[in-house]
Amino acid sequence: MSDILKNINSVNWKSGTTIYKIGDEADFAYLLEKEEVEVLSKNSVRVGFINEKEVFGEQSILLNTKRTVTIKTTKDSVAIKNSQKKQSL
């Protein structure tokens, strides 16, 4: 448990920040604490939103794949990120 906690950090983003994009290596999973982020597919087509208290980025970590969507902030946002690639629970 202490290994998990030492790898958790808070991160703040300004509106319009790209958190990750399609094809990026999967290095972090996130828990959105404040505001929302948009999910974009190829050609920047919006396919959804991630809201407060939702997790994102975990699928690519668990499947050991590159990012399949782009995530971008719509407002100034805050999240918790876990910096370990894979965790055993």
Model-derived regions: residue spans:
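Regulatory nucleotide-sensing modules
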Residues: 1-40, 52
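Cyclic-nucleotide recognition modules
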Residues: 47-89
